[in-house]
Amino acid sequence: MAAESGKIDPMHQFEVTPLGGGFNLGGQEVLFTNSALWMVVAAITLGLFMWGGMRRQLVPGRWQVAVEGFTGFISSMMMANIGTEGRKYTPYVFSLFMFILFCNLLGMLPLGVLGLHPFTVTSHIAITGVLALISFAIVLVVGFWRHGLHFFSLFVPHGTPLPMIPIIAPIEFVSFMVRPFSLGLRLFVAMTAGHVLLKVLSGFVINGFNAETLWLGSIVSVLSFTLMIGISALELLVAGIQAYVFALLTSLYINDAVNLH
């Protein structure tokens, strides 16, 4: 938490800071940062979660039920959006969904009381943008692999009158090209906004108790803390919803490449 003259900077939590020595790669210094650390933590946590749930038991435990619930949820979504062809892409979309979900949830851990500062990886457009570009690249590869140049027919909706094609095709093309930007931006904005609001409210709590008029400051602090509890619960919901929306839109984009709707 950054504090200057008693003020709390709500944007300090998003700063990427180096944690140790790096190495030189092609003239550029590569550093291990707090962002990289929490991506590693998310990957390890996710791996342990999946490993624990994949141990088959005659009577499934809660851990196994949770893992099977997630896999069944994504598998059903892929089948509903793409059909039987969706099974090929389920591992990718499932990995994407779980990674985003774990990154979102890890960023919500109240570790500040222990002197640790969790970093929300998905609060950076560089990370969400790369995830979106990977999904977009898969859509392009699948589209051209399956349909060749006929993939360009995606930009001319079925039944479009011939005179309207010069107008509709560019609009559809631009709409298609902005998909990775909107996909990455949506997740970035949603996660950043909630964390900024929580940090601002935490500043109200601290400064309220340090106010000269203690009774008034205490009221502000209590109200702010109550709001923090409610918004934290909402942020947990947003963490799951945003992971789902990212996975859902990815599956819909893949469906366009597979079925050329």
Swiss-Prot record:
SUPFAM superfamilies referenced in this protein's UniProt entry, alphabetically: F1F0 ATP synthase subunit A
Gene Ontology MF, one: proton-transporting ATP synthase activity, rotational mechanism
Gene3D superfamilies documented for this protein: ATP synthase, F0 complex, subunit A
Transmembrane segments: 30-50, 63-83, 96-116, 125-145, 151-171, 187-207, 214-234, 235-255
Membrane topology: Multi-pass membrane protein
Localization: Cell inner membrane
Superkingdom field: Bacteria
The keyword Secreted is annotated on this UniProt entry: no
Subunit details: F-type ATPases have 2 components, CF(1) - the catalytic core - and CF(0) - the membrane proton channel. CF(1) has five subunits: alpha(3), beta(3), gamma(1), delta(1), epsilon(1). CF(0) has three main subunits: a(1), b(2) and c(9-12). The alpha and beta chains form an alternating ring which encloses part of the gamma chain. CF(1) is attached to CF(0) by a central stalk formed by the gamma and epsilon chains, while a peripheral stalk is formed by the delta and b chains.
Similarity annotation: Belongs to the ATPase A chain family.
Function according to Swiss-Prot or TrEMBL: Key component of the proton channel; it plays a direct role in the translocation of protons across the membrane.
HAMAP family: ATP_synth_a_bact (MF_01393)
Protein name: ATP synthase subunit a
